[in-house]
Amino acid sequence: METATFVAIFISCLLISFTGYALYTAFGQPSNELRDPFEEHED
């Protein structure tokens, strides 16, 4: 396999993994522990 193909596949997998982790953190189980600054600072 050529080096450019390997690098492209590696970067694509890395980007997809990061996006999946970000979505899991935002909407999955850990989202219950996130604070909402708008609810904390009501005027």
UniProtKB/Swiss-Prot annotation:
Keyword Chloroplast attached: yes
Membrane protein topology class: Single-pass membrane protein
Domain of life assignment: Eukaryota
Main location: plastid
GO cellular component annotations of the record: chloroplast thylakoid membrane
InterPro entries according to UniProt: PSII_PsbN
One family name in Pfam for this protein: PsbN
Biological process (GO), any one: photosynthesis
The keyword Iron-sulfur is annotated on this UniProt entry: no
Residue ranges of the TM segments: 4-24
Keyword terms, alphabetized: Chloroplast, Membrane, Plastid, Thylakoid, Transmembrane, Transmembrane helix
Compartment(s) of residence: Plastid, Chloroplast thylakoid membrane
Family indicated by similarity: Belongs to the PsbN family.
Function of the protein: May play a role in photosystem I and II biogenesis.
Name of the protein described by the UniProt record: Protein PsbN
